[in-house]
Swiss-Prot record:
Its EC number is 3.4.22.-. It comes from Bacillus subtilis (strain 168). The gene is ywpE. The lineage of its organism: Bacteria, Bacillati, Bacillota, Bacilli, Bacillales. This is Putative sortase YwpE. The active site is at 17 (proton donor/acceptor), 78 (acyl-thioester intermediate). It is an enzyme of class 3 (hydrolase).
């Protein structure tokens, strides 16, 4: 979402679709709980984040993708699986990273 973003460094924002099929793409985020793990990989390293917050914001509030000094992930999707102006934002803090294995 930003040219300068890097996994494991600063704010790493990702956006995905929220479909009517609740188990696809970012649909399951509506049920995520604080403390849940988010795992992403660049196939060199795996990054584990712990969910710290879940909020609904306006689609116009783009500040959530801005760089921060925290090592965090920001997941963004529509708050409903229909046309909506709300965005579900899930934030997590980096808790670990390690070499990727197949």
């Amino acid at each position: 979402m930003r040219r300068d973003q890097k996994m494991g460094e600063g704010n790493y924002p990702l956006a995905g679709h929220h479909l009517k099929q609740k188990n696809l793409l970012f649909g399951p985020l509506e049920n995520i709980k604080t403390g849940a793990q988010i795992v992403i990989t660049d196939f060199k390293k795996d990054y584990i984040y712990s969910v710290t917050s879940k909020d609904i914001i306006s689609e116009m509030d783009a500040d959530v993708v801005e760089e921060t000094n925290k090592k965090e992930i920001t997941l963004i999707t529509c708050d409903k699986a229909v046309k909506t102006e709300g965005r579900l934002v899930v934030k997590g803090e980096l808790v670990d990273s390690f070499g990727h294995t197949n």
